[in-house]
Amino acid sequence: MNTVSSWIAIAAVVTAPLGAAAAQAPDGAIERAVAAWAKVRTLRGTFEQTVTNSLTGTSAKSKGEYVQERPNRMAIRFAAPMTDAIIADGKVVWVYLPSSAPGQVTKRPATDRSAVPIDLAGEFLDAPRTKYDITPAAARTVDGHQARGFVLVPKKGVAAPFTKATVWIDEDDSLIREFEIDEPSGVIRHIHLTSVEVNAPVDRKAFNFPIPKGVKIVDQTKP
């Protein structure tokens, strides 16, 4: 299982009567989202996740908490009965997934963002028009917030942990409220951020990962 990872895009609903005004709308939306994310230093809240495997026809739901301190600290902890956790402490990324890989914890370089991005929205907000092909998605209401939908597909040559992503951005504060990613394995991962708190104080202890007793460390930080 990969981490909560995924993010933002830009599109327009173009109709003949609207002409050029419609074509300009997505630029404003993405710029507002980029500007809003630039002001975020910390992020914390709760999430719900649904993972669907099209090959097996199964799905699983889970929930948990996340804490992020940009640029390189992240803690994602799943709620009981799961004990899975993904912790980026600023130096390495610890991936502990006993629900799918029992008895081990993987230690990855903090620079390895291919499978475990450590920036909740940076994957989408870093030059999105350059990196992704964009199309519109249906808007929806997320926890009482009107949210615009966008689809992005990585352009040829762009490395990304997904083949397609759909995101919903709050029309009021331009923050991501919900997103869905299609992974190369065929898994579809839907994330609903049930609460979002921006720039609140965070305890650095949240980014500590005490290694569980008896687990094997798979060290991928060495060549």
Q: What is the predicted role of each segment?
A:
Residues 48-54, 77-79, 96-98, 153-155, ...:
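A generic structural motif
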Residues 1-11:
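Bacterial N-terminal signal peptides that target proteins for export
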Residues 27-37, 90, 118-121, 166, ...:
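Extracytoplasmic/secreted envelope proteins and their assembly/folding machinery
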Residues 130-214, 219:
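Gly/Pro-enriched, hydrophobic low-complexity segments
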Residues 40-42, 61-63, 69-71, 81, ...:
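Extracytoplasmic
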